Amino acid sequence: MLTTTCRRLSQALQRPHALSAVAQRCLRAPGARSYADQNEKAEQPRTFHPALLQFLVCPLSKKPLRYDASTNELINDELGIAYPIIDGVPNMIPQAARTTRQKEKQEETKQH
């Protein structure tokens, strides 16, 4: 099972433009940092790669998540929580998640 998952992840990341700056840096020798790496940080913000959604699940419900590009969050509609994505890396710590249902409840009360 782990082999299959690793193979699928590898295939997803090998698609054109799939390797982000973070992934490319991870593939280099550990500890090797260059001046070019520092310039990359200033030039391009890191973005989340949607191909990773097939491997990510909510740590609380173990259900799939959906990516909302407008808020840059991974959302669990069932529980009404959203995990932030910071520099292209999802913060999947439950304490870091925000609730989304409060907004829905406020909108419903305003309509009535």
UniProtKB/Swiss-Prot annotation:
**Residue span of the annotated presequence:** 1-34
Q: Which Pfam families does the record match to this protein?
A: Trm112p
InterPro entries documented for this protein: Trm112-like
Q: Does the keyword Phosphoprotein apply?
A: no
- Tell me the Gene Ontology biological-process terms attached to this UniProt entry: protein stabilization
Q: Name one GO cellular component term.
A: mitochondrion
Cysteines joined through disulfide linkages: none
Do the record's keywords include Plastid? Answer: no
Q: Which UniProt keywords apply?
A: Mitochondrion, Transit peptide
What's the domain of life for this entry?
A: Eukaryota
Q: Where in the cell is it found?
A: Mitochondrion
Domain TRM112 as annotated: residue spans: 49-95
* UniProt similarity note: Belongs to the PREY family.
Q: How does it assemble?
A: Interacts (via TRM112 domain) with NDUFAF5; the interaction is direct and stabilizes NDUFAF5 protein. Interacts with COQ5; the interaction is direct, stabilizes COQ5 protein and associates PYURF with COQ enzyme complex.
- Protein role: In mitochondria, S-adenosylmethionine-dependent methyltransferase chaperone that supports both coenzyme Q biosynthesis, by stabilizing its components, such as COQ5, and NADH:ubiquinone oxidoreductase complex (complex I, MT-ND1) assembly, by stabilizing complex I assembly factors, such as NDUFAF5.
**Protein's name according to its UniProt entry:** Protein preY, mitochondrial
